[in-house]
Amino acid sequence: MDKKINVFFGKYKFNTILGLLSIGIAFYVAMFTKTDTGYEWYFLIPGVFGFLLLIVRPLSFTDTGSIGPLILNYTMVIKYSISPLVSCLGGYHSWLGRYPGEDNINKAILITFYEMIVLFFENVYLTKKYKRKQINNVEISKPLRGRVAHCVIIVLGFAILFAMPSAFMDYRFLFDQTDLATTIRVDFAGSGIYKTLFTFARYSLVLVIVDFFYKRNLKRDSAINIIGAFIPTLLNCLYVSNLSRIGIFAPLLSCAFLIIILFNTPKARKTILYGIGTIGLLFIIYLSFVKFFGEGRGDTSNATSWLWWGDTLNMYFTGIKETAIGIKAKSLIDETYGLNRIALMFNDCFSNVSFISNLTNHDINSNKLYNIVYFGGNISVSQICPNICEGIYYFGTALSVVWPALFVYLSHLFSYKSHEKEYIDLKFIYIYSAIYCGMILMLNSAMIVCNIINISVLYAVVAFINKKVRIGVIKR
């Protein structure tokens, strides 16, 4: 009896709490969802999700060593548990976009249920697999292999910032609230490459500073070294494009978790985690309020409206309405591409990748066509097409879950590789990729692929060059 209690309220007590909460939400949604809305079976998603959390182990909500899966686990809770509750409280009200129709909502609930089941069990299997592999590994962390390439990138990136200010018109500091109503778009030739080089420079500067304090800490363990490494990570998040929350969240997490790996003591881990949690949460809350309710952005009365929050949460976590519109958009996708799904996938995945994006057609990628259906015309491209819908476009309904499942696998693989690699820059490459793959339920494939290639893959090239330069210097 004691063993059973320990399973539920010991190591996995957080799973038990979330599982019971989800089941409670399922009962609430079942009782208070009106008929003829299309959402009558919505309660099954939080209900089954909660049941699985109770009986299936070992998903962790506290394992900071697996950053990609950790993010995935929390976003699953929001999409499959919290979102149904908030949507129900708001009466499934929609304040943005067109109504997709009851039939498409029914299909969206079914496809979301399918997605949840497959991703949950895949996540459990991969968690067990990589946990077993990590037990046999001893993690080693080493400083940067030279700084020559990083210093060149820093000089080049910041030189571009000052020489080509027009390429960075959409960038602003976090606390700059001027002209909030305008979303600035910069798309002239070469602007994407300039931004990539500047982003490179920012990360290189952070890595060089982190490397400096890590070397100091190897000689003498001190909290000052942890703080010194964390400050540039924090400053790196203050200057972002159009006050993007992902633009703050991803850099903050990727660099902070790198610091956790390097300064791997219980005291350091706790200090950094509390720092990330407090500062990150304050930034996200502040930025969300500014973007939603700042001057010219929206009505402040929405801040206390369940109707508004229910629909907004669905937008950010690819909810039922968003999936239903994605299903409705399939006819437009078919009309545009016919059977040529390779062209569609190429347009989707590489539309924002530096040096390749000019080979794609932005006007007919799935996100553009999705937004045409979403708004009923060529009005905006602000909404994100869910990955499960892109899976439907590429592989059909039966195999649609293959697409998000691929990124779930990569989130586990990259998280594991971040511990397997020894050098700081290589660890950063895999941490950054793991974070973006872990946000699969929040982002579309274009956003994930472009960040992995623009930053991680190109950074791997820089790491390789840095290694060769260092070897050449040593041989001399």
Regions found by a protein language model. Name each.
Residues 178-195, 283-407:
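Small-residue-enriched transmembrane helix-hairpin modules in multi-pass membrane proteins
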Residues 34-42, 127-268, 280-297, 371, ...:
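Membrane-embedded catalytic interface detector for glycan/lipid assembly enzymes
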Residues 22-28, 50, 205-208, 229-236, ...:
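Hydrophobic, membrane-inserted alpha-helices
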Residues 67-80, 151-165, 279-286, 346-360:
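Hydrophobic alpha-helical membrane-insertion segments
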Residues 64-67, 211-227, 416-428:
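Membrane-interface helix-loop-helix junctions at transmembrane boundaries of multi-pass membrane enzymes
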Residues 380-476:
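Hydrophobic alpha-helical segments
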Residues 45-50, 153-160, 197-207, 381, ...:
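Hydrophobic alpha-helical transmembrane segments
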Residues 1-138, 225, 229-232, 251-292, ...:
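N-terminal "leader" segments that precede or initiate the main folded domain
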